[in-house]
Amino acid sequence: MLAAIHFLFCKLAQAVGVAAARALPQDPAVPVIATLDLHANISTRIVDNTDILISYITNPHVDQYERAQEAARVMAEMFEGMKPQAAFIRLPIVAPTVTMLTAQGPYADLIDYGQQAKTDAIVNVSVVGGFAFSDLAKNGLAVIVTARSDLATARGLAEDI
């Protein structure tokens, strides 16, 4: 999902789309999983209407296939009973897009730290930078850590990052 999309008449259009997807199934056990690029503008509405958000961990974006595989693995775990719990923190920082490379630099360090900090209790760590050219209040660096069951574990790692 391109998570920085918005229109003049609909800010954060992807939040509207995710909410619509959540409303479709009559069974709340149907997972709603989204993969997104690193330039996502994350809102509480997106987090609340998905079971898990999985961001790319490379910029340039070359890991879409691996993130789709990760989403499929998470879905399989959910069908087996896993109840993911997500902690979401948005920081008041908007990095210029050219500084959001993942091979080296401060943003790469955040991505690497999150990936290295994953344990069996943590199913995903996503650090997204937002899209600097979006004129939105929900723009900026966001950390979403999803635990397999324990929100406190997810929150602790999100705050640490």
What are these model-derived regions, one by one?
Residues M1, H39, Q85-F88, D135:
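Core alpha/beta catalytic barrel or barrel-like domain that forms the active/cofactor pocket
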Residues M1-G81:
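Active-site histidine-anchored catalytic micro-motif
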Residues L24, V30, G81-A86, S134-L136, ...:
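Aromatic-enriched hydrophobic runs in primary sequence
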Residues V30, N41-S43, H61-R67, A87-V98, ...:
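Active-site catalytic microenvironments in core metabolic enzymes, especially phosphate/sugar-handling
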Residues T50-S55, I89-I93, A137-A142:
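Short acidic (Asp/Glu) and glycine-rich catalytic loops that position anionic groups and cofactors
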Residues A68-A72, A76-T119:
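Conserved anion/nucleotide-ligand pocket segment
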Residues V98-I161:
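Hard-cation-handling environments
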